């Protein structure tokens, strides 16, 4: 198994040699990721004194909105090459990619051993770019851990990326032969094309080379026992245009679609035995969000078309079961009008709730409602037992996509300890 996998890796090493711009250093370099103590003159002084916090600053300062991840990917790849990691830049293509803009996942491992523990997060962010900045809390008597770091990606998910890398360096300092693999993917915020590219490649062999996968997302330092599933679709209505002064000469697509939207909007609150979407003790109710409606051309024209984008967070069941429920709801609400229907082919999203492992002591346990790359990574079975999957990271999802995205130094430092604990637990299962 290992020899075959090593051969696969060797064939992919088009960019695996050390980068000449960085001096070589041992894998086990001290990270100084532990909390600072004492007073400080400025927040910048604290960041500059810590290789870990400086690295986090550097990657947050690089704009990497989805489809524009190239520069931050190169920075991370160079950083890891300079620490003697073998680095593979795995090309990822997409329809939104501009000419000469290369996108790639960063896959890195520290030795010739087959990586058995995969540590992964994403390097893309949502728009718009928000510059890196620092703020201090004057009420905390110069406690460096309370310094607040703001900027796009400071939480989601460059906080996880930085903490994962430095946790891995901490582990490798004590155990240079630890079989770790680092994977930082593009496109998580726009459908997961980066993780799917890795999942479908020879870097994710069957049976799985990995007995443990550690995903990084903002979980407020809790270990996540699972997250809801996802289903995306459109509700479409077709009418006939006419002058608004003579509406009886046309058919309003908006009037036709409203009963369907009203019914679908309530499916998460309707019991399953009465035609609603299922709930579960673990995840609560399935939730429905009608996020966008596009209809008509002008107020004085009877609208000929209407379309609504819908996102469902599934608390139970499968996407196929949910599709059947939605179709029935639309049909019942419109008395079977064939010009109003649910369209699923235009949306690729669809996966059931994702249950995750929480068998490592010392963490709070929670569930989350947001989606991740967890379902985009196909887990191949192993002969020695199931592959464990963990989801953990610093920061709160409640600020992750907002203009107030921020994280404290203390949370970042605690995340390094948390990731290290998860890695060390995985090493004991070898």
From Swiss-Prot:
EC nos: 3.4.17.-
Care to name a GO molecular-function term for this sequence?
metal ion binding
Q: Which residues bind Zn(2+) 2?
A: 156
What Pfam families does the entry give?
M20_dimer (PF07687), Peptidase_M20 (PF01546)
Main site of residence?
secreted
Membership in a protein family: Belongs to the peptidase M20A family.
Q: What is this protein called?
A: Probable carboxypeptidase AO090003000058
Q: Which residues are glycosylated?
A: 84, 285
Q: Which SUPFAM superfamilies match?
A: Bacterial exopeptidase dimerisation domain (SSF55031), Zn-dependent exopeptidases (SSF53187)
Q: Where in the cell is it found?
A: Secreted
